[in-house]
UniProtKB/Swiss-Prot annotation:
Pfam families: Glycos_transf_4, MraY_sig1
Pathway recorded for this protein: Cell wall biogenesis; peptidoglycan biosynthesis
Organism: Pseudomonas syringae pv. tomato (strain ATCC BAA-871 / DC3000)
Protein name: Phospho-N-acetylmuramoyl-pentapeptide-transferase
Localization: Cell inner membrane
Cofactor(s) this protein cannot do without: Mg(2+)
NCBIfam families per record: mraY
GO biological process: cell division; cell wall organization; peptidoglycan biosynthetic process; regulation of cell shape
MF terms (GO), sorted A to Z: metal ion binding; phospho-N-acetylmuramoyl-pentapeptide-transferase activity; UDP-N-acetylmuramoyl-L-alanyl-D-glutamyl-meso-2,6-diaminopimelyl-D-alanyl-D-alanine:undecaprenyl-phosphate transferase activity
Catalytic activity: UDP-N-acetyl-alpha-D-muramoyl-L-alanyl-gamma-D-glutamyl-meso-2,6-diaminopimeloyl-D-alanyl-D-alanine + di-trans,octa-cis-undecaprenyl phosphate = di-trans,octa-cis-undecaprenyl diphospho-N-acetyl-alpha-D-muramoyl-L-alanyl-D-glutamyl-meso-2,6-diaminopimeloyl-D-alanyl-D-alanine + UMP
Amino acid sequence: MLLLLAEFLQQFYKGFAVFQYLSLRGILGVLTALTLSLCLGPWMIRTLQMRQIGQSVRNDGPQSHLSKSGTPTMGGALILSSIGISTLLWADLSNRYVWVVLLVTFLFGAIGWVDDYRKVIEKNSRGLPSRWKYFWQSVFGLCAAIFLYTTAPSATETTLIVPMLKDVRIPLGIGFIVLTYFVIVGSSNAVNLTDGLDGLAIMPTVMVGGALGIFCYLSGNVKFAEYLLIPYVPGAGELIVFSGALIGAGLGFLWFNTYPAQVFMGDVGALALGAALGTMAVIVRQEMVLFIMGGVFVMETLSVVIQVASFKLTGRRVFRMAPIHHHFELKGWPEPRVIVRFWIITVILVLIGLATLKLR
């Protein structure tokens, strides 16, 4: 929006041309979203408290979590608002990738909002039934996948890239739709499963989102893409603005979500942010790198799958409780220790993911 204004004002003052630089608009995206999140956060928390929109806590979980009961939830709306406003202000709104990521983010956020609303407002402990949650996730995920497939200008944008193996590129054809569906829906649910401790999900999301923003910036520049031997995706660089907005909004939310949390993001935030990460990775053909960098999300998801499968097949549980962050809590780890150690793991995995840019 402001990019259009800057382009118009260039005829009066050439200095406005500086807003053409993606790096500047990415930084402005961070600062705008961060400011919005920090300024709107206290008001949103008070509003949620006044309306008694608080988190309910399971009795069979760690006893330390009982003190969290009543903490305002659905704070993901703060994250999405900050991301949306910042992106609309600083991104090139004629770029199709910007709209794809925004729409996927907000549509998955809508699913989470309905789930949270039914749990918190209607006092329905089930929330949105799982079959309907996965149905709508599938609908939105498939719509995004089909759109990206049918509008891909070249085969490069539907080819599977294997990190560190520069000569291995697998044309997916229609299989691109299937892969994209699983990446978007899978990452959405993985982040949601991780969102069980104060600040546990948001910081890895910020780190992975920031790293994916770097991939988007490099893939959108033909010289960088050719030098690094990564797919050149025209227009993908504009997603650095969305990535910046995600970083700013996430850090602003963490200000209130850090231990002991004043607000939880709820499904409205977790489902949306996970879907955003998956969509960005798909656009720049870095699904495998997302799997590496989002290792904490993968670990949390696998712990649930293993726990359920083991109990159904043998009647025994592998972990004391799943997702795995609760297992460590029940082993006696203080909550802040679990959180920070998972953050450290994410830092390491993100650095490994970024290293694949040169290890080819």
